[in-house]
């Protein structure tokens, strides 16, 4: 760059900073522009690895969608529990009016510290979200769900009234307002969404999500969660085998997958993931039905091995750290939090 151009650029930058404030424009090599992305663990080791950065990125919009009873709300409650372990504050906008507080507590959520709102309209839900984000004091907000964000005009109208595109316009306007503030306040905002079928689609995927296309564009991460099987114990179904696919990721390569178990009344089985990922990484040995670690047997069958790790959290943590090391994923700063969760399991 010539001296004349450099001088003109410096003058332009000075004018922009004077008009819009310091930090409104900067070089990528300066200060916070190159800082590592701050993340919140999902509570699933496999999903943290699939996301590429160790969790869900803060200061971004995340969409989690899937069929009914696929584990969407369970996953977000696990993220809230992980955030609370490191001292964060979370809010849950329950537009569906269906949050089970007792279930949230079982997943490790500190319910007395969780902010909960059950708004009457979509506008009210998004205004509350905007106010919380602008306060700068909230670390994470969950909106459950986009499909339940009913516009005021629809609520006040008659059953059967045709109001095309109303919800999509509401979401588009809200996200235009929210995105910049979310980035500045470093708040993680998760939208839970449902799946609908497009009528008349002959080729391609007929599935789509509610609320228009705005959320697809504004989301930095989109997770597709599906139940792919049942977990049985003595012919009794005790949980679901779940697959999460990272269909969009602006902070790491997308299209990675994670498979984990969700146990009824417990949430994501951390110990089950450690066993599965340990076997894949050849850290845990499997011979027939027996699992062993460092030459010592830890259980016959996955259930017994899971129980062993639950009773020996220090061994579980050691295996987890070795898995992270082998995959090049830095150990999470909230590592101590898992030991607390294991201690809670032992008390139960």
Curated annotation (Swiss-Prot):
GO terms for molecular function: ATP binding; ATP hydrolysis activity; ATP-dependent DNA damage sensor activity; damaged DNA binding; single-stranded DNA binding. The keyword DNA repair applies. One of its GO terms (biological process) is SOS response. ATP binds at residues 66-73. Keywords: ATP-binding, Cytoplasm, DNA damage, DNA recombination, DNA repair, DNA-binding, Nucleotide-binding, SOS response. GO terms for cellular component: cytosol. Its main location: cytoplasm. It is found in: Cytoplasm. PANTHER family: MITOCHONDRIAL DNA REPAIR PROTEIN RECA HOMOLOG-RELATED (PTHR45900:SF1), RECA (PTHR45900). HAMAP family: RecA (MF_00268). Can catalyze the hydrolysis of ATP in the presence of single-stranded DNA, the ATP-dependent uptake of single-stranded DNA by duplex DNA, and the ATP-dependent hybridization of homologous single-stranded DNAs. It interacts with LexA causing its activation and leading to its autocatalytic cleavage. Belongs to the RecA family. This is Protein RecA.
């Amino acid at each position: 760059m010539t001296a004349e151009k450099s001088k003109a650029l410096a003058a332009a930058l000075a004018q922009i900073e004077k008009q819009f404030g310091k930090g409104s424009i900067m070089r990528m090599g300066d200060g916070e522009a190159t800082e590592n992305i701050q993340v919140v663990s999902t509570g699933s080791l496999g999903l943290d690895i699939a996301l590429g950065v160790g969790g869900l990125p803060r200061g971004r919009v995340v969409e989690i969608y899937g069929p009914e009873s696929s584990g969407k709300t369970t996953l977000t409650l696990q993220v809230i529990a992980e955030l609370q372990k490191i001292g964060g504050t979370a809010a849950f906008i329950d537009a569906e009016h269906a949050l089970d507080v007792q279930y949230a507590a079982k997943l490790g959520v500190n319910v007395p510290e969780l902010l909960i709102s059950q708004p009457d309209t979509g506008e009210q839900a998004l205004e509350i979200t905007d106010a919380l984000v602008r306060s700068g004091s909230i670390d994470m907000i969950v909106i459950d769900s986009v499909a339940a964000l009913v516009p005021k005009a629809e609520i006040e109208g008659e059953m059967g009234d045709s109001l095309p595109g109303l919800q999509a316009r509401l979401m588009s306007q809200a996200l235009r307002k929210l995105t910049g503030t979310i980035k500045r306040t470093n708040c993680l905002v998760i939208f839970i969404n449902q799946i609908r079928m497009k009528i008349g689609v002959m080729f391609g995927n007929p599935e789509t999500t509610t609320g228009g296309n705005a959320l697809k564009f504004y989301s930095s991460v989109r997770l597709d969660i599906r139940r792919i099987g049942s977990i049985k114990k003595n012919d009794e179904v005790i949980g679901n085998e779940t697959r999460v696919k990272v269909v969009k990721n602006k902070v790491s390569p997308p299209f990675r997958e994670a498979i984990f178990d969700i146990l009824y009344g417990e949430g994501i089985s951390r110990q089950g993931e450690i066993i599965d990922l340990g076997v894949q990484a050849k850290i845990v040995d499997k011979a027939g039905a027996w699992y062993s670690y460092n030459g010592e047997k830890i259980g016959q069958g996955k259930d017994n091995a899971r129980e062993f790790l639950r009773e020996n959290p220090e061994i579980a943590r050691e295996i987890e750290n070795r898995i992270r090391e082998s995959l090049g994923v830095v150990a999470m700063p909230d590592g101590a939090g898992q030991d607390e969760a294991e201690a809670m399991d032992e008390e139960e």
